[in-house]
A protein has these predicted regions:
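Conserved GNAT acetyl-CoA-binding A-motif
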Residues: 62-73
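Acetyl-CoA-dependent GNAT
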Residues: 1-32
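Conserved acetyl-CoA binding element of GNAT-fold acetyltransferases
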Residues: 19, 31-44
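Conserved active-site alpha-helix within GNAT-family acetyltransferase domains
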Residues: 77-94
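Conserved acetyl-CoA-binding loop-helix of GNAT-fold acetyltransferases
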Residues: 39-41, 47-64, 83-87
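Conserved G/P- and acidic residue-centered "switch" motifs that form tight phosphate/ATP-binding loops
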Residues: 14, 49, 66, 78
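Conserved catalytic-core motifs of GNAT/GCN5-like acyltransferases
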Residues: 73, 91-107
Length: 119
């Protein structure tokens, strides 16, 4: 699946804050379990909504690839990521159980929250 990865950088200082990636396409395992967007903000920069803003900045880019809906998933106990999805404009849809053959299940994860973003 085609994907892009970008650095999150502070607009004023240029300091690296984390990274974000966008997966292009609608494979079932991405839509249901993995999500189109993934992000990580370095611990010392958390709490400033950098991930939410970075997600929003990628929406036009996703649209330029013909995407009209994006999915983001996170662990149910990851309150910060759930809040990021809400701040970025996502709609909580459901919590799903991961199938046993899913890579994330093999890593010990069992469920994912699914958020939908209509572009």
């Amino acid at each position: 699946m085609p994907a892009y990865e970008f650095e999150m950088r502070h607009r004023g200082s240029g300091e690296k804050l984390g990274h974000i990636n966008l997966r292009i396409g609608n494979m079932d395992k991405i839509v249901k379990y993995g999500g189109h967007l993934g992000y990580d903000v370095y611990p010392e920069h958390r709490g400033h909504h950098y991930a939410a803003r970075s997600c929003q900045l990628l929406f036009p880019f996703a649209m330029s690839h013909g995407m009209s809906t994006l999915w983001v998933t996170c662990n149910p106990d990851n309150i910060a990521s759930r809040r990021t999805c809400e701040i970025a404009g996502g709609t909580f849809i459901e919590i799903v159980d991961l199938p046993e053959d899913n890579d994330q299940y093999q890593e010990g994860e069992r469920q994912k929250c699914r958020y939908r973003f209509e572009l």
